[in-house]
């Protein structure tokens, strides 16, 4: 068996080449730490990937990020990508929810909300009564639905809160933990009792802390991507790693060795051993659990217990002139509507460069925790389903000239009730395995910004010699 000897100094093996693993490896190597990245598949990026097809620029997974995370902007700057960040078209600020038989605009302000038809009048007045909400008892892991009903009422929870979580988690509003999925809401309740009061006070504080004239905040807060899609970030990270990134390198086993770690690797039909001081497992939870099982069965069970919602992304492209460009970012469909689609992004409206020559591109989402079985259908069936739902929900009768389907059986980690307790237990169990670290979207944030921020923090901790960093 070929043996890769341990090099001098601290060295790290990063297992998994999604955005979390790539970012950790990049940060470590840019700080002078010898790090190698091992990815079992033939490409880097994990769920993140952009494809230029037939005049369309389609994302296979995540489609954008909010330009509000310093770690993401710092990573873009380090990779010389700041000039390639593109903000969404202003039209994308308008969003829609399918409720009571049609698409309805989500109001952008409290006065607009009270005057809108997004909810029946009684439900809108109930939301206004949120000013008199009571705090939850301390130490209760409350579902997003229970939190919403207490603050906003039943209708607003079933329509608005469910739609919001669907766009992020594609989850079950009755099962998701509010503290794990929307910690800012829990913080606002704790500090201000009322979410409305908290929002008003936050706006006031923001105005008082306004920057002096002539200066501008570095972070726009805008929905953003790169000029060639999110693949631009993946390609830049891959280029920064160079030969330190190995694709087709599957880690078959992991064992403790002389205060460090030994990895058994199969790469392009050859088996090899690699000895390192530290290991970062950045693979999805199920793959991480498989590697952990021989080391610590209890830890492996904790990690394996993280549920995922399957997702299918169905892109439908329409020739110029066959239908009007849709308004706004897109629409979401609450579970109570019992439709077969979670929602759709108006991709060519949000980022016009995603479709050439006046073409129109819809990116439809199917499955989630509410209908996981739909994702098991073949691509033709999923494309037909998306066409039918788009016609029923948005009135699109034109026939698409372009279709592309991406299926993710393990799509989005579900931060269900007990998730924070589970992550704390994982962290405690890792104390028994010094030099081993977990990272990825299964633990402390599912979004691109979360992954990049957590990767930077882990790299900082490793370089500083703090080996007890939480996942």
Curated annotation (Swiss-Prot):
<dbReference type="GO" id="GO:0006782">
    <property type="term" value="P:protoporphyrinogen IX biosynthetic process"/>
</dbReference>
<feature type="binding site">
    <location>
        <begin position="39"/>
        <end position="40"/>
    </location>
    <ligand>
        <name>FAD</name>
    </ligand>
</feature>
<comment type="similarity">
    <text>Belongs to the protoporphyrinogen/coproporphyrinogen oxidase family. Protoporphyrinogen oxidase subfamily.</text>
</comment>
<dbReference type="InterPro" id="IPR050464">
    <property type="entry name" value="Zeta_carotene_desat/Oxidored"/>
</dbReference>
<comment type="function">
    <text>Catalyzes the 6-electron oxidation of protoporphyrinogen-IX to form protoporphyrin-IX. Does not oxidize coproporphyrinogen III. Involved in the classical protoporphyrin-dependent (PPD) heme b biosynthesis.</text>
</comment>
<keyword id="KW-0472">Membrane</keyword>
<protein>
    <recommendedName>
        <fullName>Protoporphyrinogen oxidase</fullName>
        <ecNumber>1.3.3.4</ecNumber>
    </recommendedName>
</protein>
<comment type="pathway">
    <text>Porphyrin-containing compound metabolism; protoporphyrin-IX biosynthesis; protoporphyrin-IX from protoporphyrinogen-IX: step 1/1.</text>
</comment>
<comment type="subunit">
    <text>Monomer. Homodimer.</text>
</comment>
<keyword id="KW-0350">Heme biosynthesis</keyword>
<dbReference type="InterPro" id="IPR036188">
    <property type="entry name" value="FAD/NAD-bd_sf"/>
</dbReference>
<keyword id="KW-1003">Cell membrane</keyword>
<feature type="binding site">
    <location>
        <begin position="61"/>
        <end position="64"/>
    </location>
    <ligand>
        <name>FAD</name>
    </ligand>
</feature>
<dbReference type="Pfam" id="PF01593">
    <property type="entry name" value="Amino_oxidase"/>
</dbReference>
<dbReference type="GO" id="GO:0005737">
    <property type="term" value="C:cytoplasm"/>
</dbReference>
<feature type="binding site">
    <location>
        <begin position="16"/>
        <end position="21"/>
    </location>
    <ligand>
        <name>FAD</name>
    </ligand>
</feature>
<feature type="binding site">
    <location>
        <position position="251"/>
    </location>
    <ligand>
        <name>FAD</name>
    </ligand>
</feature>
<dbReference type="GO" id="GO:0005886">
    <property type="term" value="C:plasma membrane"/>
</dbReference>
<keyword id="KW-0285">Flavoprotein</keyword>
<feature type="binding site">
    <location>
        <begin position="446"/>
        <end position="448"/>
    </location>
    <ligand>
        <name>FAD</name>
    </ligand>
</feature>
<dbReference type="InterPro" id="IPR004572">
    <property type="entry name" value="Protoporphyrinogen_oxidase"/>
</dbReference>
<keyword id="KW-0274">FAD</keyword>
<dbReference type="InterPro" id="IPR002937">
    <property type="entry name" value="Amino_oxidase"/>
</dbReference>
<dbReference type="GO" id="GO:0004729">
    <property type="term" value="F:oxygen-dependent protoporphyrinogen oxidase activity"/>
</dbReference>
<feature type="binding site">
    <location>
        <position position="408"/>
    </location>
    <ligand>
        <name>FAD</name>
    </ligand>
</feature>
<keyword id="KW-0963">Cytoplasm</keyword>
<feature type="binding site">
    <location>
        <position position="47"/>
    </location>
    <ligand>
        <name>FAD</name>
    </ligand>
</feature>
<keyword id="KW-0560">Oxidoreductase</keyword>
């Amino acid at each position: 068996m070929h043996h890769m000897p341990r090099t001098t100094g601290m060295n790290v093996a990063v297992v998994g080449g999604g955005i979390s693993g790539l970012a950790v490896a990049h940060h470590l190597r840019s700080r002078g730490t010898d790090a190698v990245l091992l990815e079992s598949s033939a490409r880097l990026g994990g769920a993140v990937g952009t494809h230029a097809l037939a005049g369309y620029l389609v994302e296979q997974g995540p489609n954008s990020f909010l330009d509000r995370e310093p770690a993401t902007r710092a990573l873009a700057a380090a990779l010389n990508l700041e000039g390639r960040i593109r903000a969404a078209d202003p039209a994308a600020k308008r969003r829609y929810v399918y409720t009571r038989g049609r698409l309805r605009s989500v109001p952008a302000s409290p006065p607009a909300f009270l005057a809108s038809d997004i909810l029946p009048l009684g439900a809108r007045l109930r939301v206004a009564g949120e000013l008199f909400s009571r705090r939850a008892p301390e130490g209760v892991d409350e579902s997003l639905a229970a939190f919403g009903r207490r603050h906003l009422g039943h209708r607003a929870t079933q329509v608005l809160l469910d739609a919001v979580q669907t766009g992020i988690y594609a989850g079950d509003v009755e099962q998701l933990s509010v503290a794990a999925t929307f910690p800012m809401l829990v913080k606002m309740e704790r500090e201000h009792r009322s979410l409305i009061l908290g929002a008003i006070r936050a706006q006031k504080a923001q105005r008082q802390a306004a920057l002096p004239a002539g200066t501008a905040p570095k972070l726009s807060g805008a929905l953003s991507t790169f000029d060639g899609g999110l693949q631009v970030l993946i390609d830049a990270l891959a280029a920064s790693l160079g030969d330190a990134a190995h694709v087709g390198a599957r880690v078959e086993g992991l064992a403790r060795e002389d205060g460090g770690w030994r990895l058994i690797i199969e790469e392009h039909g050859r088996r090899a051993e690699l000895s390192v001081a530290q290991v970062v497992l950045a693979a999805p939870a199920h793959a991480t659990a498989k590697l952990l099982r021989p080391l610590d069965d209890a830890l492996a069970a904790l990690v394996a217990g993280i549920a995922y919602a399957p997702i299918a992304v169905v892109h439908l492209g329409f020739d110029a002139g066959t239908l009007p460009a849709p308004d706004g970012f897109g629409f979401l469909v609450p579970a109570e509507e019992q439709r077969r689609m979670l929602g759709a992004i108006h991709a060519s409206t949000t980022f016009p460069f995603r479709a050439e020559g006046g073409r129109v591109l819809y990116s439809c989402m199917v499955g989630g925790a509410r209908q996981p079985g739909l994702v098991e259908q073949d691509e033709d069936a999923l494309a037909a389903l998306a066409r039918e739902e788009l016609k029923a929900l948005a009135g699109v009768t034109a026939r698409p000239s372009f279709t592309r389907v991406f299926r993710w059986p393990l799509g989005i980690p579900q931060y269900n009730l007990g998730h924070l307790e589970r992550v704390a237990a994982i962290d405690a169990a890792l104390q028994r395995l010094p030099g081993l670290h977990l990272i990825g979207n299964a633990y402390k944030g599912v979004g691109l910004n979360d992954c990049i921020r957590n990767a930077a923090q882990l790299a900082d901790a490793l370089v500083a010699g703090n080996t007890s960093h939480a996942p």
